């Protein structure tokens, strides 16, 4: 293994990376509002469902297709179309925009600059999983490691946000993360088996909850 890309991957997935992930629940705040997520157990259940649904069939599959050579502009357009909840779509673009900006300064490459150029020209929007994937691929990170890092970084940021919002204790958050290991490993296996027709096949219940968040009266998060 290359220590160079390993260190770069750790930097890219560190919770201190200023992408704004702390401001997004990606739907779980709606479940808190409805009393469905209220403690360690119920959040862990929601999180594992989120990993097996949206993270696998949307973000994870986008990453795999990118590594397999599918045009980044095509994938960008499909992601914009399939992320039905406005706040979640905007979250992907805001965090993706920050990743593109940070990557351009810290991990510059011709591939990354080409994607940034598409975004500047208005030909692409700049989604988070694609920004991450372009940077990771240009660094020589293998697909499975990139998937594992991206999925677990998302799980970590959501858990940190749940610790504040529910609230949970710090140790409870760590137990949730440990319980998510198998879900992330299973998601990597599932993503490898999916086909193009599966791209964006997310649970309607999750999408509806994400849409409800827009009109929620009291909110801690932007999504």
From Swiss-Prot:
The question of whether Lipid metabolism is a record keyword is answered with no
Q: Report the GO terms under cellular component.
A: cytoplasm
What the record says about family reads: Belongs to the UreF family.
Q: How does it assemble?
A: UreD, UreF and UreG form a complex that acts as a GTP-hydrolysis-dependent molecular chaperone, activating the urease apoprotein by helping to assemble the nickel containing metallocenter of UreC. The UreE protein probably delivers the nickel.
Residues passing through the membrane, by range: none
- Name-wise, this protein is Urease accessory protein UreF
Q: Where in the cell is it found?
A: Cytoplasm
Primary location group = cytoplasm
Domain of life of the organism in this record? Answer: Bacteria
The source organism is Paenarthrobacter aurescens (strain TC1)
Q: Which InterPro entries match?
A: UreF (IPR002639), UreF_sf (IPR038277)
Output the Gene Ontology terms for molecular function: nickel cation binding
Q: Source gene?
A: ureF
Job of this protein: Required for maturation of urease via the functional incorporation of the urease nickel metallocenter.
Recite the UniProt keywords alphabetically: Chaperone, Cytoplasm, Nickel insertion
